[in-house]
Amino acid sequence: MDYNGVLVGLGNPGARYEGTRHNCGFALIDAFVDFGYRHGTVDEMNGGKFSCQLWRVRLPRLDGCWLAAKPQTFMNLSGQCVQPLLSWHKLKAADLVVAHDELDIPPGELRFKFGGGNAGHNGLKSITELLGTPDFYRLRMGIGRPPHKGDVTNWVLGRPQGEDAENLDHILPLALDVLFAFADKGLDSAVRLAGKTTRPRKPVRQTANAEASNNSPEASATPQNKDNT
């Protein structure tokens, strides 16, 4: 079967990471698949050979069929899912859209781009290394930076609260609109639409350490030989 593209949302597997900032890519896949069930056709596929959860989504707004994947590796091993997934389906890096959290974008805002650096994101780094190219599309979902330097790990692995959580929820339908704009009209349209997103309000943030202790026990603990950031 021919596919128009592949949407991969980055995150860490397991209940302990559900709802964390680092898993906003997973949240987008959930929203995309749910939209597909309501407005199109969705087939759940066997993604075991690619170490991912995998769906085939057909939507009129996509003018065809897309794959949607949630890697079940840890974040820094995301490429071990993406590279074989593309290879098996005879797709190129340029057919790939990766949705991921972005520290340098405020919560409630989006950016869309093709290629570029990884900005310290281990999931993007793994994908770039195993594909052998940075030339794929990125749907960047803003999570903002922590209020105190040095606690980035606790921040990305923490669960947002209050207005901060509302800001992150706010971008999910907007992110779908950006994806549909890209599928329908191409890169420039997606870039313009993403650039129009603004924070609905200034979030009041807890410290990352408080969030980690309140919402994600052991969230800062890195499993042996794994890197969840």
Curated annotation (Swiss-Prot):
Site (Discriminates between blocked and unblocked aminoacyl-tRNA): 12
Keywords from the named record: Cytoplasm, Hydrolase, RNA-binding, tRNA-binding
Binding of tRNA, residues: 17, 74, 76, 122
Function according to Swiss-Prot or TrEMBL: Hydrolyzes ribosome-free peptidyl-tRNAs (with 1 or more amino acids incorporated), which drop off the ribosome during protein synthesis, or as a result of ribosome stalling. Catalyzes the release of premature peptidyl moieties from peptidyl-tRNA molecules trapped in stalled 50S ribosomal subunits, and thus maintains levels of free tRNAs and 50S ribosomes.
Family (UniProt): Belongs to the PTH family.
HAMAP family: Pept_tRNA_hydro_bact (MF_00083)
Protein name: Peptidyl-tRNA hydrolase
Species annotation: Desulfovibrio desulfuricans (strain ATCC 27774 / DSM 6949 / MB)
Lineage: Bacteria, Pseudomonadati, Thermodesulfobacteriota, Desulfovibrionia, Desulfovibrionales
